[in-house]
Amino acid sequence: MTLNQVVQRIKTIALAHKQINDFREGDVISFLRSGDIVYPACLLQILPGRISKAERQTTVRFALYLCDKVDLSIDSKDNELEVKSDLLSIAEDMMAAFDYPTYKLDWDFADEASIEFLDEDLEDML
């Protein structure tokens, strides 16, 4: 698969999820500066990878950011936990979708992924 095909497939999977409203590919700063994000959103950031002649394999690494807003006008701690819970569910759903049998024909997706919850005070706050 080409890099374009990989990105397009991830975009298709992300936007097929009923909770994801927006998908972008790029860096975090550009994503946050775009100003027209429809949350919950997914950002795909391509990271350094590798090409192995011996294994005849190209490894593409990326960071997948799942983002949503916390409504500060209601009980923010409970709302924040609810948002994190929803985003974790989305991540689990996407990991399962990456492993779909048809996709296994042309890509081998890692069995594990690291997760990290980030809290940022940004302009995109309610």
Regions found by a protein language model. Name each.
Residues 1-26, 46-126:
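Charged, amphipathic alpha-helical segments and their flanking helix caps
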Residues 37-48:
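A short, hydrophobic beta-strand-centered structural micro-motif
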